[in-house]
Swiss-Prot record:
GO MF annotation terms: calcium ion binding; GTP binding; GTPase activity
Residue stretches making up the EF-hand domain: 5-39, 39-74
Name of the protein: Ras and EF-hand domain-containing protein
Organism from which the protein derives: Xenopus tropicalis
Gene, per the UniProt record: rasef
Entry GO CC: perinuclear region of cytoplasm
Length: 722
């Protein structure tokens, strides 16, 4: 046990010298340590050589312990080994441990204690200090003075600290005494205040009691005075009653009693009559109340029906206005075609006159085969009669009229074979609506008659027009495959100018027109969201494929129509662009009641618009009786990186997906400026809307356009007959 304690103390001493904590002392470290302890370099080298037993130029803990034990065995007798180890021999006669080092301490240590005088009491762990003193005295006596100097410094600091502690204790005691004095003063002051309050309350209570007592005295005096007055009156009445004759009084009283009895009976009769009339009036009032309640309910139902009729009337009026605009445009186009027809007839007549005057005209008149058709513009008398009937029908029927006008187009309308590029915006107009038209031109058979007449084969020329229902007032035109016209006598090739799709055949176009004209349902889609999130730009990109950076804020509600092919079927969408400003929220909320779907937009570069999405969804749920499909659209995705680099807080895609999953809504990020994911978002929402409406029994929110479509030919007929 003693060896373990000795090793632990030696290890602690070694670690104090080992500043690098490497477990060994280099020669440089040992020299620096000896220089701090004021040991000469020669003595330091001698001590290092004695401690470095394995001659590896470093002192390990084992070398240090071995050298320390060897030095102790040379200089100390064996009887004092316990003193070196710091464990004095235990003796039952000396139980006090503090007296053991004094008995076994060296004379040098005792002399040092005498020199310290009273400061010895401030040395902590005096036993360990004495052991270290003896060890240093044995190993290196020159270090004793430095060790004594260190101990004196420690004793001085400990003494100062003890003095400071005493001063602090005195200060704390003074503070406690002062606090106690202040507390006693506060208690005295509180007692004084309480006494003053008690005195004031007692005075007030005494004053109030005196006032109450005075009031009671006054009341008592007034009552006594009233009693005295009544007593006097009673005495006077008693004196008067003694003087009145009793018989006369009895007769008068009987008459008065009889009169009062009759009056009482009459009043009772009147009371019964009044109660009866009140009961009748009450029953009539209840009947009137029930009638009023029934009438109010019926009036509310009528008002709801009227509101529904009003909405339908507004929709129909809007559609009629669109059709009227389309009719006016058709009328203008008919005028243009009529003028073109007149010009073509003039050219046709001139060409006939030229042919009649040519030498080949004799063959044309004499040959029965040539009377059928010798040129694209020659017609037989029979065909002329048919053409006259056809033209007369065209005057009444706008569809036939358009066919006739196209059949008689002049040669200037025939292309030379060079393609002409047209902007798609040339055919797009916000208020333009055109019915489906299919132009057919009959094929004229031609035969070859030797070399007298030129052989010109005129194949069938069909001008077709791809039609789609009103897409927000925009009509999409697609150029069709041009049909070539060849001639055996000439190598020229000409193409018919057409505004139809280049990748759609005639049969496909007819099928598409048939499908589009039978799309009777229009689904109401409402665009919602905060102001300046890009709803109007989204709608403009969807309907017109345009983007304008200087669009103004929407006031109230804007309306557009768009037709999309969803799962192979044409779907007409009514797109309602609502204002996102706070003052128009009530208007936007009213449009949610009959909506089939909602496009809820927010700005990915504006965190506030994303946080307000929950309020918009709550508004939609409050306004609708059933759950409707919602497509959450994060717009302006193209600006997110730029705004994030500028330090703005942007909404990431993960946040939008989590929020959409929370509410069971669809989600998509778009860019109205770049046009990305615009059509995809609307297609997904339209698909969900169609699924929901197909599964519902109540289809009140779907507008039936069959009546409006059936009226289009009649309206166009009336328009053309003007």
């Amino acid at each position: 046990m003693e060896d373990k304690d000795e090793l632990s103390r030696l290890r602690a001493l070694f670690h104090t010298f080992d500043s690098k904590s490497s477990g060994r002392l280099e020669k440089g470290q040992f020299s620096a340590l000896c220089a701090e302890l004021k040991v000469s370099p020669s003595e330091a080298e001698d001590i290092f050589a004695r401690l470095d037993s394995d001659k590896d130029s470093c002192i390990t803990f084992e070398d240090f312990a071995m050298g320390f034990r060897g030095a102790r065995g040379l200089h100390m007798p064996e009887g004092k080994k316990d003193v070196e180890q710091g464990e004095p021999p235990k003796s039952p006669s000396t139980p006090d441990k503090e007296e053991k080092p004094e008995e076994t301490s060296s004379p040098a240590w005792e002399d040092f204690q005498r020199r310290l005088a009273d400061e010895v009491n401030y040395i902590p762990r005096r036993e360990q200090a004495s052991i270290l003193y003896q060890n240093i005295n044995i190993v290196e006596p020159l270090l004793i003075q430095q060790y004594e100097h260190v101990i004196r410094n420690f004793v001085r600091e400990i003494r100062l600290q003890s003095t400071e502690m005493e001063n602090l204790a005195i200060a704390v005691k003074r503070a406690q005494d002062k606090a106690a004095i202040q507390l006693s003063e506060l208690e005295e002051e509180m007692d004084q205040r309480i006494q003053a309050v008690e005195k004031r309350v007692k005075k007030e209570e005494k004053r109030k009691s005196e006032e109450a007592l005075n009031d009671l005295k006054r009341q008592h005096e007034s009552e006594v005075a009233e009693l005295q007055v009544t007593i006097k009156k009673l005495k006077k009445l008693e004196e008067q009653s003694k003087n009145i004759n009793l018989k006369e009084d009895v007769a008068v009283l009987r008459r008065r009693l009889h009169d009062l009895t009759m009056e009482n009976q009459k009043l009772r009769k009147d009371l019964l009559e009044a109660q009866t009339s009140i009961s009748f009036l009450q029953s009539e009032l209840d009947a009137l109340k029930s009638d009023y309640a029934d009438q109010s309910l019926s009036s509310e139902r009528d008002m709801d029906i009227i509101r529904g009729f009003t909405d339908e009337r507004e929709n129909l009026a809007r559609q009629i206005e669109i059709l009227q605009t389309a009719n006016r445009k058709l009328h203008d186009s008919n005028d243009g075609l009529r003028s073109a027809l007149e010009n073509s007839l003039m050219k046709y007549n001139r060409s006939l006159r030229t042919i009649n005057t040519s030498p080949g005209s004799t063959i044309s008149r004499n040959s029965p085969k040539l009377t059928r058709c010798t040129s694209p513009y020659d017609r037989s008398p029979r065909s002329s009669y048919l053409d006259e009937d056809y033209d007369s029908l065209a005057v009444c029927d706008p569809m036939q009229r358009m066919n006739c006008e196209v059949d008689s187009l002049p040669e200037s309308c025939i292309d030379s074979g060079l393609s002409t590029l047209r902007d798609s915006n040339e055919y797009d107009s916000e208020a333009e609506y055109r019915p489906p038209r299919i132009f057919h031109r009959s094929r004229f058979p031609h035969e070859n008659y030797g070399g007298d007449a030129s052989d010109t084969d005129v194949p069938e020329i069909r001008d077709e027009e791809s039609y789609a229902p009103d897409n927000g007032g925009n009509l999409d035109w697609k150029p069709s495959n041009p049909v070539s016209r060849s001639s055996s006598g000439a190598s020229s090739s000409r193409k018919c100018i057409s505004a139809l799709s280049a990748n759609v055949t005639s049969a496909e176009t007819v099928d598409k027109v048939h499908k589009y004209t039978h799309a009777e349902k229009a689904y109401k889609i409402v665009l919602a969201g905060d102001a300046a999130v890009g709803k109007s730009s989204f709608l403009m990109r969807l309907c017109k494929n345009e983007f304008r950076g200087n669009t103004s804020a929407t006031l109230g509600v804007d309306f557009q129509m768009k037709t999309l092919v969803v799962d192979g079927e044409p779907t007409i969408l009514q797109l309602w662009d609502t204002a996102g400003q706070e003052r128009f929220r009530s208007i936007a909320k009213s449009y949610f009641r009959r909506a089939d779907g909602v496009l809820l937009l927010y700005d990915v570069t504006c965190e506030k618009s994303f946080l307000n999405v929950r309020e918009w969804i709550d508004m939609i749920e409050d306004a609708t009786s059933e759950a409707i499909p919602i497509m959450m659209v994060g717009n302006k995705a193209d600006l997110r990186q730029l705004m994030a680099e500028q330090g703005h807080i942007c909404v990431s895609t993960n946040y939008g997906e989590k929020l959409s999953r929370t509410y069971g809504a669809l989600f998509c990020e778009t860019s109205a400026k770049e046009g990305s994911n615009i059509v995809e978002a609307v297609l997904h929402l339209a698909r969900e809307v169609r699924k929901r409406c197909d599964n519902e029994d109540d289809r009140g929110s779907v507008t039936n356009l069959s009546a409006a479509i059936s009226k289009k030919p009649a309206q166009m007929k009336n328009c053309c007959n003007v």
